[in-house]
Design a protein with these regions (language model features):
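Glycine- and acidic
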Residues: 1, 44-46, 72-77, 210-219, ...
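Catalytic cores of nucleotide-enabled group-transfer and carboxylate-activating enzymes in metabolic
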Residues: 34, 53-56, 63-76, 198, ...
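Short, acidic/polar
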Residues: 5-17, 198-208, 346-360
Length: 364
C-alpha cells in the first residue's frame, strides 16, 4: 500500500503497527534529486517510481509521534544543500514534538540532479562534501549544545521574563564554509543533539562516521567483509578519541522467509517476477554515475573511476569475486536487496544466518 504515501493516515497507521510490534524505530530514507543517469532521462524512474514522486519526510514524523510513545524516528537529510542554522532548528523542533525520539541520518547527497536543481553547476566532489559535512556538524553541535544553558528558560510570570538573556550565547562560528555568529533559535530539546546515523563505505565516509555517528549503516556482501568494515570503523573511532562501543553498526540485509526453505525460495522467485530490471539499472545509474544503457547487457563491466558512491562497484566485485558483472547480472542478482545480500529460507535457516552475521561480522 505504499502508493498511499501522500495520505497522513498511511503514516499514522504504520506508526501504530510498528509500536504494537515493539519495533525500536522507523527509518525514512530520502533523496532531493532524481535518478536520471539511465538513458540520460528521468523517464525510467518515473515509470518505475524509483524514489519519485516523494514528499518531505520531516512532515510525517510529528503525526506519527502523537500516536506512539516508544517508537523512534530516523529522518534523512542531505546537508550539502542545507544551512546548519536552519536545519538545527528543524531537528530541535522534531525532538521537542517527539519528546526526544528523533535521529538524523546524515547524508552528503550523491545525485548530480540534486546539485543542478539546487543552484550548482555540478556535484561537489566526494571528499569536499565530507569536508562540508564535518564543519556543518560542528556548527550544529555548537547550536544544540552550547547556545542555551539548561536553565535559560525561566517562564517567570511575576518578573515578566521568559528567557534569561545571560544564559543564551551566540556561537560565533566563522569557518571555511559557514559563518553563524548568532544564537540557536530553539530552546534545549530533550536530546539537544539528535541521534546521529551515517552511511558511507568510502575511506572518507568511514572517517566521518568514526568521528560523528552513533549508528552506522554498512552494506557488505558477506559477514567476513562486514567484520573488516566494522573493525575499521571502530578502530577509527578509537583514534578519534571515542570508545569502540560508542557506536552501533547496522548492515543492510533483506530477509525472505516462510514455513520452510522451499516455500521461502518459491516466495523469492515470485517476488523476482514483480521486479523491474530497467528500474534496477536506473537506481544503479544514480548510485554510480554510469549509464548502463550504453553497455551491452552481457558485456563485463570493469571498475569505472567516477565521483559517485565509489564503493558500489567495489561491492559488486566483492559480492561474487568469480563473476564478471554485467548489466544483466545486476538485474538478475540485485533487483531484490539492492546493495545488500538477500537471506532466503525457513525460520531456522534465516535465524542461523543472522547469528552468523552478528558473530562473524561484528554487527550489532
Amino acid at each position: 500500500q505504499a502508493w498511499k504515501y501522500k495520505d497522513l493516515d498511511y503514516w499514522v497507521d504504520l506508526a501504530k503497527l510498528l509500536e504494537r510490534g515493539y519495533f525500536d524505530s522507523l527509518f525514512i530514507a530520502d533523496v532531493v534529486g532524481v535518478y536520471d543517469v539511465y538513458r540520460g532521462s528521468v523517464e525510467t524512474s518515473l515509470i518505475d517510481a524509483d524514489q519519485v514522486p516523494v514528499n518531505d519526510p520531516f512532515f510525517q514524523v510529528p503525526a506519527m509521534a502523537t500516536v506512539t510513545k516508544h517508537l523512534g524516528f530516523g529522518v534523512t537529510s542531505a546537508l550539502t544543500y542545507e544551512q546548519p542554522y536552519a536545519l538545527a532548528r528543524k531537528f530541535s523542533t522534531l525532538d521537542h514534538l517527539t519528546k526526544g525520539r528523533v535521529a538524523w541520518n546524515v547524508v552528503t547527497s550523491y545525485l548530480n540532479s540534486a546539485a543542478v536543481n539546487l543552484g550548482l553547476k555540478q556535484q561537489i566532489s566526494h571528499d569536499e562534501r565530507y569536508d562540508i559535512a564535518d564543519e556543518f556538524l560542528d556548527v550544529t553541535y555548537k547550536l544544540w549544545e552550547g547556545s542555551w544553558d539548561e536553565d535559560a528558560v525561566l517562564r517567570d510570570r511575576e518578573k515578566g521574563i521568559f528567557t534569561d538573556p545571560s544564559k543564551v550565547h551566540p556561537i560565533g562560528h566563522k569557518g571555511k564554509y559557514f559563518d553563524v555568529p548568532g544564537i540557536h533559535l530553539s530552546e534545549p530539546s530533550p536530546q539537544r543533539t539528535p541521534v546521529i546515523f551515517q552511511a558511507g563505505a568510502s575511506t572518507r565516509g568511514r572517517a566521518f562516521a568514526a568521528k560523528h555517528a552513533e549508528g552506522v549503516f554498512i552494506s557488505p556482501a558477506t559477514p567476513e567483509q562486514a567484520r573488516e568494515v566494522s573493525d575499521d570503523i571502530r578502530n577509527r573511532a578509537v583514534e578519534a578519541g571515542r570508545t569502540r562501543d560508542s557506536l552501533k553498526i547496522f548492515t543492510l540485509l533483506t530477509v525472505i522467509t516462510a514455513e520452510s526453505d522451499e516455500a521461502a525460495q518459491a516466495k523469492y522467485q515470485e517476488y523476482l517476477g514483480y521486479s523491474n530490471g530497467e528500474g534496477m539499472l536506473s537506481f544503479y545509474g544514480g548510485w554510480t554515475g554510469i549509464d548502463f544503457s550504453e553497455y551491452d547487457p552481457d558485456q563485463p563491466l570493469e571498475a569505472i573511476d567516477n565521483d559517485s558512491i565509489r564503493s558500489v562497484l567495489e561491492l559488486l566485485a566483492t559480492a561474487d569475486p568469480h563473476r564478471k558483472w554485467t548489466p544483466r547480472d545486476i538485474i538478475k542478482h540485485r533487483s531484490i536487496g539492492g546493495l545488500g545480500p538477500v537471506l532466503v529460507g525457513g525460520p531456522k535457516t534465516v535465524a542461523d544466518e543472522l547469528e552468523r552475521w552478528v558473530d562473524v561480522g561484528g554487527i550489532d
